[in-house]
Structure formats: structure tokens, C-alpha cells
């Protein structure tokens, strides 16, 4: 069950192990099943406000479910957490894809939203940027109308915005408006398989005249040997919650307008559905370190978002056994030696 104390322990460990950032997702209704898959979630902004107060270096990102929160409120909450964190805060914007999350509270705008959600998000981020950059907005659009709307104090640092688009529309939005774009890794122990997605993002950003890199998501399942790590992975697959995964598949098919290459379609692929196909690195500490170096070498990759089969032990294992073997993290050793 998620608690603040658990999340605090995880993020403080991540800071101690020199992780660069921590991001919390938002889920307003899970997938059910015997495991109650994602049925229990803390609210992202209030969680990250608390974590900002008990950390000192790590960057903190909260996720805004934009159908549930007016942009002016998000702008003010973000400015508040920026103050708490000393300028370490950023916002992940999600349009929303799982209809029951929003329908349960009367906020689903209709299934035509699937085809116009990035128009909605474009107006949303325009209001955010107005308020963060100038402290006021008079934006008038199809979805939002601001009348001398104000936010003060403004953030002390430029507010970073991230998004997670893999559809053409999602990438076009990120190219125009985001600072980074998240994408899923692909497959099991195929660290460079996401390269075409990163290349599409790079091309979209170049077309927009901006530099927007990809942050790729992988799950790490590591142990002292390849065999021990593989045994864990096989154990997890054997216990897959088929009822919850069936619900996910059903919901992923509701959007018929975004094309085949989307995060949600990848999540529902049966290949590695037990961990929603986020891309998985399974192996010894040395094997995982080597594969993460391969990830970092993919053109367009700006960073990696890691999740673990067990966060508390996984973060320590990463910091103590995997990260020291990674060539792409050599700069951390140099920093430690200088200090």
C-alpha cells in the first residue's frame, strides 16, 4: 500500500544514490484484478510537495491529470512546490486515456476527446507558460478563457515541462512545448530497441526548431548473476494478474484515433504484459550496467527513467553495484574524487 513514509524512504535513497530526478505518476482508477493493480495511489502534487521538503538535491516532478485540474491551479501549485524545493520542481502533463478514471467523477468530455486532446493540452500549456513566465494570462481559446489571471510568486527557476507522447500528435506537441519527452523502452534485454522512437522525437524537434530529447523508461530486475535475475523475472510472469491485464487491454482499445504506436498500445501488448511492456532489463549487475550504457548511447537519449521490482532494495543495488560499472555515469566518480 503506498504511503508517504514509503515514498519518502524511496526518494531519499534515490538522492543518496545520486539519482538525478524522481517522478510520481497519477492514477485515479486502477486496473483491479486479484492484485488490485494500481488501485491505490497517492495524489501526485501533494505527495511531491511533501517530498520536496525532505530532500535537498534531487529534482522533483509531479504529474498533472489535465482533465481534472485547471491550468491556473497547476501553475500556482507548481510555483508553491518550486518555493518548497528551492527551484527543483517540474511538471509532467498527461492528457488522460483511461475513460473510467474521469467518467467516475463526471469529467470525461466524450470519446471525441481522443482526437483533440493535444489541442486541449496546447492551450493548457500556453496558460501555464503565460503564468510562470509573466505572472499573468489573458489567453482566450476554445477550452480556456483567462481574464487577467495572475500567479505570484512566480517560480524562481524556469519550470520544466515533460510529456509522454509516442503518437505523431503526442510527439508534435512535445516538440513544440515540452522540455523532454518520455517514451517506453521496448522488449526484454533489447536496450536499443526504442531507437526508432527516439529518432522520431529528434526529427519532430528539429522540424520545430527546438532541442527536445527522449527520456526512456525501463524496469530493472537485477541480481548477482544473470540466472538469479532471470528466475525473478520468470516468477513475476507466472503470477501475472490476467483479470487486470484484460481490463488494461480493453481500455487501450477505446482510443481508435491515435494510431498503433502509442504508449497505451504498447502497455497492452501481451508479450511482457506483467509489467505493462515498459522495456525490461534482466540480468546481473554487470549485465544491467552494460545494457544501460547501450541505452545511453542511442542518439536522442537525454536520460533514463528507472523503475524496479522492489524500489527500496533496487535503488540500493543500482547505486552500489550497477552505477559504478556504468561508463555513462563516470562523471559521478570524478565528482566524488574532487569532493
UniProtKB/Swiss-Prot annotation:
Under Gene Ontology molecular function, one entry of this record is: uracil oxygenase activity
This entry's Enzyme Commission designation comes to 1.14.99.46
Q: Which reaction does it catalyse?
A: uracil + FMNH2 + NADH + O2 = (Z)-3-ureidoacrylate + FMN + NAD(+) + H2O + H(+); thymine + FMNH2 + NADH + O2 = (Z)-2-methylureidoacrylate + FMN + NAD(+) + H2O + H(+)
Binding positions (FMN): 26-27, 92, 101, 117-118, 167
Which EC class is this protein assigned? oxidoreductase
What is an annotated GO biological process for this record, any one?
nitrogen utilization
UniProt key word 4Fe-4S:
no
Q: Which UniProt keywords apply?
A: Flavoprotein, FMN, Monooxygenase, NADP, Oxidoreductase
**InterPro entries for the chain:** Luciferase-like_dom, Luciferase-like_sf, Pyrimidine_monooxygenase_RutA, SsuD_RutA_monooxygenase
- Domain of life where this protein originates: Bacteria
Family matches, as SUPFAM superfamilies: Bacterial luciferase-like
Q: Does the keyword Nucleus apply?
A: no
Q: Spell out the family assignment given in the record's similarity comment.
A: Belongs to the NtaA/SnaA/DszA monooxygenase family. RutA subfamily.
What task does this protein carry out?
A: The FMN-N(5)-oxide reacts spontaneously with NADH to produce FMN. Requires the flavin reductase RutF to regenerate FMN in vivo.
- NCBIfam families listed in its UniProt record: RutA (TIGR03612)
Q: What is this protein called?
A: Pyrimidine monooxygenase RutA
Organism in which the protein naturally occurs: Cronobacter sakazakii (strain ATCC BAA-894) (Enterobacter sakazakii)
